[in-house]
Design a protein with these regions (language model features):
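Conserved hydrophobic/aromatic pocket- or pore-lining residues that grip, position, or stack substrates
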Residues: 38, 65, 104
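Extracellular S/T/G-rich loop segment that most often corresponds to the catalytic His/Ser-adjacent loop
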Residues: 128-130
């Protein structure tokens, strides 16, 4: 449980039943989202290192980013049309999916064709992430989905922002526009009805959620997506 909390996703169903390696103190899973963020982090640090004239640090960080970006292709399931987490004990890919599966786009690990499939088959799939309010923190057709139980369905602004940032790396104009519009609408719905900028949002009603602070700084990221998209 503690290891899953270190992901920042607390009670996400993605890690339910995943074995814990007591030797390495790690969950036995290769995670698309965390790997995508690691690559993104390495690229940002590499840029900073080059600007500061630290060429050795730049080479190391850029090399790490490229290594793991290429390795992420092993997590692509061509039948399913998405990058999937992989259990390291049996090597099987996990079909429990969340917005973090889109973070392969943040690492630029996907081809344009793969990115388009991810949008068509999953982002716009009403059984998974599409709907009046998006994006739920676990696919709507997951057995653990409840729409309002923290990371088991609730909508979180940082997830929307990270998916949007990933989309920016590809030619996905309609998906970017749709995500920005729905994010803005979700923010304004709560602000106009209650004057709230919430920690997270109910994935079916778009409003009240028992496990959510009424005011939380990252809720405003929903509006930031719209402002960036409309420049």
């Amino acid at each position: 449980k503690g290891a899953s909390y270190e992901s920042g996703l607390d009670n996400t169903p993605m890690y339910d039943g995943v074995e814990f390696d007591t030797t390495k103190n790690l969950l036995k899973i290769q995670d698309v989202g965390l790997t995508g963020l690691y690559v993104m982090d390495c690229e940002a640090l590499a840029y900073m290192a080059r600007e500061l004239g630290q060429e050795d640090a730049y080479q190391e960080l850029a090399g790490r980013a490229e290594k793991y970006k290429k390795a992420m292709q092993a997590l692509w399931d061509d039948n399913f049309g998405l990058f999937l987490n992989r259990h390291t004990d049996g090597k099987q890919l996990s079909k429990r999916i969340s917005p973090t599966n889109f973070y392969a786009l943040n690492a630029k690990a996907a081809t344009q064709e793969q990115a388009e499939r991810m949008m068509k088959e999953h982002f716009y799939n009403p059984e998974e992430f599409w709907g009046d309010y998006i994006m739920p923190s676990i696919a709507r057709n997951d057995t653990a989905y409840t729409a309002e139980t923290y990371w088991r369905g609730s909508i979180w602004a940082p997830m929307n922002l990270l998916v949007y940032w990933g989309m920016q790396n590809y030619e996905l104009p309609q998906a970017k526009d749709d995500l920005s519009e729905k994010s803005k609408d979700l923010l304004l719905k709560n602000w106009l009805e209650k004057g709230w900028v919430r920690e997270n949002y109910h994935a079916e009603t778009g409003s009240y959620n028992k496990r959510s602070e009424h005011f939380y700084h990252w809720g405003a990221l929903l509006g930031m997506i719209y402002l960036v998209e409309n420049g």
